[in-house]
Design a protein with these regions (language model features):
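Formylglycine-dependent sulfatase
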Residues: 1-168
Length: 168
């Protein structure tokens, strides 16, 4: 988002939920720069830039230049399937049906379609960050069956997880 390594942006390790660690609000981000050039901006997916997600104590996606955002702090929970921890523009969404990668892609696609319809001449930027293939892995059973030569069940789950992103 900044074009810099995490260390240069003040993030030195992974960011567990409920910690003071976060990307500093004064970081210049690509969406913030594009907004100054007249772009509309959207973020959909994993927002792993703070420990206090969707709380005023730390900056949120909208503070970094996103007009529309649909995200989780870290992973889709309780798993990639039927997640319940998404937030849209500061409002909790509740339990969703389906796999996270497809939900994230659909949200971005709907935003793009709506934006182009309402503002056909305005350029836009969409940032999509899938949760997959991060653990805990959950994949469609129909895709797991595509990998009968996998040596372990975990391998088939992983391959199906990547395939599911391809179809998102």
């Amino acid at each position: 988002l900044t074009g810099r390594t995490p260390n240069r942006a003040g993030v030195y390790d992974w960011i567990p939920s409920g910690t003071k660690t976060h990307m500093k609000k004064n970081e210049l981000t690509i969406p913030a720069m594009l907004k100054t050039a007249g772009y509309a901006t959207c973020m959909s997916g994993k927002w792993h830039c703070n420990g206090f997600f969707n709380r005023k104590e730390q900056p949120q996606p909208g503070d970094f230049g996103f007009d529309h955002w649909f995200a989780t702090q870290n992973n889709a929970a309780p798993s990639h399937e039927n997640p319940r921890n998404f937030v849209r523009n500061g409002k909790e969404v509740g339990k969703l049906k389906g796999f996270s990668c497809r939900i994230v892609a659909q949200e971005a696609g709907k935003w793009i379609e709506s934006h182009v319809k309402k503002n056909p001449d305005q350029p836009f930027f969409t940032f999509v960050a899938f949760h997959e293939p991060h653990e805990p892995i959950s994949s469609p059973k129909s895709m797991i069956k595509n990998y009968p030569r996998a040596k372990k069940k975990g391998e088939a789950l992983y391959y199906a997880n990547v395939e599911n992103m391809d179809y998102a």
